[in-house]
A protein has these predicted regions:
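Structured adenosyl-cofactor binding patch, chiefly the S-adenosyl-L-methionine
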Residues: 75, 108-114, 122-139, 186-231, ...
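Short, hydrophobic beta-strand segments that form beta-sheet elements in well-ordered domains
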Residues: 28-30, 46-52, 75-77, 143-145, ...
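Glycine- and other small-residue-rich loops at beta-strand/loop junctions that grip anionic moieties
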Residues: 2, 28, 94-95, 119-120, ...
Length: 236
């Protein structure tokens, strides 16, 4: 039973709340039974698993938690054990710095069977806020670098693109979204094959990046599941 604040396992958890240590050690920390269960169900084994009242004094575990309500379980995992690879649809994110939005987009990618590619400048998907927003999807969704995503690149822009439902696509698709404040820079847009916009009827200037990405993924999934929509989307 861990009963000292100076215990090395507790010190490790504290360190891993800092991105610099996560990057240096190649580890991440999850808080709460739901996230730990998501890791287990995905076949990702913990390096350390601390359980309040079983192998650590509850008050000490609470002290190293970032949550307002202390979790019963805190786990440490290897980043290298997270899924990698490609899927037919990839959500490529350019400098999406808000961890809540990033985690939500990873969760949406999980729901619609997509992968996620991240540029430099994105929030850390293994940070505490992003992990909570992803609801454990981080253990199921393959991640890649922004330039590693393969397929026809479609930039999702607020205005001026082809209406998303009218876009003609076939094969692998990379849906490219920009940062919350600045969107996509010209050099990224220049590397895209198409520009698409989500039709809006209301006066809102634009959609939140997590909402826009989710709608884009839904539209692509809808086409993939509908034979008639799939036929109409193929290029002649």
């Amino acid at each position: 039973m861990i009963a000292s604040r100076d215990n090395e396992r507790l010190k490790l958890v504290r360190k891993l709340h800092d991105r610099r240590w996560r990057d240096k050690l190649g580890l991440l920390v999850v808080e709460g039974e739901d996230l730990a269960e998501s890791a287990r169900d995905a076949g990702v084994e913990p390096v350390e698993l601390l359980v309040a009242g079983e192998n650590v004094v509850p008050e000490l575990l609470a002290e190293v938690s970032t949550l307002a309500h202390p979790p019963r379980v805190v786990g440490v995992y290897r980043r290298a054990d997270l899924p990698r690879g490609a899927r037919p649809v990839t959500l490529a994110l350019w400098r999406v710095a808000d961890p809540g939005n990033l985690g939500t987009l990873i969760r949406s990618a999980d729901a619609f069977g997509a992968g996620v590619a991240l540029s430099a400048g994105c929030a850390d998907p293994t940070g505490p806020k992003a992990l909570r927003a992803s609801m454990g999807a981080i253990f199921r969704v393959p991640l890649a670098g922004f330039d590693e995503a393969q397929g026809r690149r479609v930039a999702l822009v607020p205005h001026g693109g082809t209406p998303l439902p009218e876009l003609r696509l076939a094969g692998e698709v990379v849906l490219v979204l920009g940062s919350e404040r600045d969107g996509l820079p010209e050099e990224v847009l220049a590397g895209c094959d198409e520009r698409a916009s989500i039709p809006q009827r209301g006066p809102a200037e634009s959609l939140n990046v997590a909402m826009a990405g989710t709608i884009g993924l839904y539209e692509l999934a809808r086409r993939a599941s509908s034979p008639s929509a799939r036929r109409s989307s193929l290029r002649s």
